[in-house]
């Protein structure tokens, strides 16, 4: 079996969501990810903060603290509450959610993990553009992930590099794709039984 844990969390180190412009997880998030892996988890995936955060390899297992806004819906549905000024739902939402139009909320990444004989050996990181250049992005494609232009891809990957460095994660950039290679001494066989704290011998 392969055990993955996903958590929706808005906090970063200093504040709620992206308002502090911080790209690192709150301490309790990292502690939780480590404890879960200590008890048999194979992969941690966080989301909800709206901005990219780093990648950590802990005991040979990946921790994706936040991929960014992979696909975020910026426009309200027809049953949205009435708004003042006779604005359409799209107009009202664009004004109300202007923070979603900031650069940090319009870049993200997807990742693919590669295993051999049950061991993580490589992670590929694919940068995503959710409409950074509004002048070139049709309204209908806004906030929908697309392959970025080479220059933007390099910028996004360099940022993921920087956010991952404090965790000791080394990311190389090859043909506009980020690559993490796991040294043999860091690999751990996945699929071990998940030990839940508080149950049986795993209790602390």
Tell where the protein language model's regions lie, with residue ranges.
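Beta-strand-turn-beta hairpins that frame and shape the catalytic cleft
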Residues: 1-3, 59-63, 118-121
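Conserved residues at the C-terminal ends of beta-strands
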Residues: 6, 47, 126
């Amino acid at each position: 079996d392969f055990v993955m844990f996903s958590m929706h969390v808005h906090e970063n180190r200093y504040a709620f969501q992206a308002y502090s412009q911080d790209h690192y997880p709150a301490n309790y998030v990292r502690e939780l990810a480590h404890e879960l892996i200590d008890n048999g988890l194979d992969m941690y995936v966080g989301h909800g903060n709206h901005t990219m955060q780093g990648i950590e390899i802990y005991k040979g297992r990946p921790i994706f603290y936040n991929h960014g806004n992979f696909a975020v819906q910026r426009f309200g549905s027809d049953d949205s509450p009435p708004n003042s000024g006779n604005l359409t739902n799209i107009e009202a939402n664009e004004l109300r959610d202007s923070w979603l139009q900031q650069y940090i909320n319009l870049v993200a990444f997807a990742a693919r993990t590669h295993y051999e004989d049950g061991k993580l050996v490589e992670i590929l990181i694919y940068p995503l553009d959710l409409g950074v250049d509004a002048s070139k992005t049709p309204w209908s494609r806004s906030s929908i992930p697309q392959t970025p232009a080479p220059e933007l891809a390099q910028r996004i990957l360099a940022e993921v590099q920087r956010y991952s460095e404090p965790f000791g994660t080394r990311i190389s950039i090859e043909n506009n794709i980020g690559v993490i290679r796991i040294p043999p001494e860091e690999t751990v066989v996945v699929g071990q039984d998940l030990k839940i704290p508080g149950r049986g011998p795993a209790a602390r």
